[in-house]
Every structure is written in C-alpha cells, then in structure tokens.
C-alpha cells in the first residue's frame, strides 16, 4: 500500500473501475491530466501521484518577517486527510485516466520515504504502459533500486529553513 496525500492521484475523472467521478477535477473539466508547469518537461501533459509524508519540515521567514511553510504541507507533515491504496489500484486508476498522456510525476512530500512501494509502482507503470516517470524529490534520500525505473529526477534541494526530525538531521546537514 502506498500512503497518498489528499487528492493523491490528480487530476483524474474516472475511478478504479473506469466510472466517471461525481466531482469534477479542480480544472472544472471532464478531462484527465494537466500540463507539467515546471522544469525541463514544462508543457508536457502529465498525471500526478502525490505521496504523503516528508523527512523535512521546511519553514522560512519572508523579508517582511512573516513565517511561511512548505507549499504542500498537507502532503508533507499535515497529513490528516491522507489515505492508502494498493499499487495495483493506483495503476488501474492511472490506466482509466491516461488518454494520450505518457508522463507520470510522482511527488510528495518525499516519495523515497516509501521507496519499496515507489519501486513497485514504477515497475507496474513501466510494464503495463511504458510511461515516462519523473520523481520530484527533496534530494535528501537516494534509493538506487528505484533509479533504474525512473526516467527523470526533479531535484528540489532545501535550504537552512528545512528541519528534519532528529534521526535524519546529521545526514541532512552533511548533504545540504
């Protein structure tokens, strides 16, 4: 089971059985997918899988002195509305919403906190549909067993405002 943040697979219009969802995606359209808006693959039609949990707790001060936190705190450390799904069900949902989309973005939180399940998901997505897979990561964890199935890593290194829990602090400070 993968632990997903709320709206963990998005934007989709069909459920695991291929039936239309009662609620429209945030776009307001009965069209699955969106356009990757960042980085090298900017403009590529994509589906996203947002996993729950992060090994960091990013906060920072603005020039005006306001405290800000992670832009996806609901996926990182405020995971009250998270849920779990089996890898096979995620693959079915993706399959029913694929259309002409060939790109999957696995993001978080930090996906590599669930490395074994991410690896299993990537294996299934490659086996079933030959998707191009991007993983968006904070670059504090590297799991070699996953690397061979991932086509592109989108690294988002963190600054001194990221404060991981104690077990990860030494590694974080060395690799920052």
Question: Residues of each region from the PLM?
Answer:
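Conserved AdoMet/S-adenosylmethionine-binding subsite of the radical SAM
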Residues: 91, 95, 103, 112-176
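Short glycine-centered, acidic/aromatic-flanked micro-motifs in structured strand/loop junctions
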Residues: 108-109
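Auxiliary Fe-S-binding modules of radical SAM enzymes
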Residues: 1-38, 43
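A basic- and aromatic-enriched beta-loop-alpha substructure that forms the phosphate/nucleotide-
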Residues: 20, 24-29, 90, 97-104
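Short linear motifs at secondary-structure transitions and domain/linker junctions
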Residues: 21-27, 78-81, 126-133
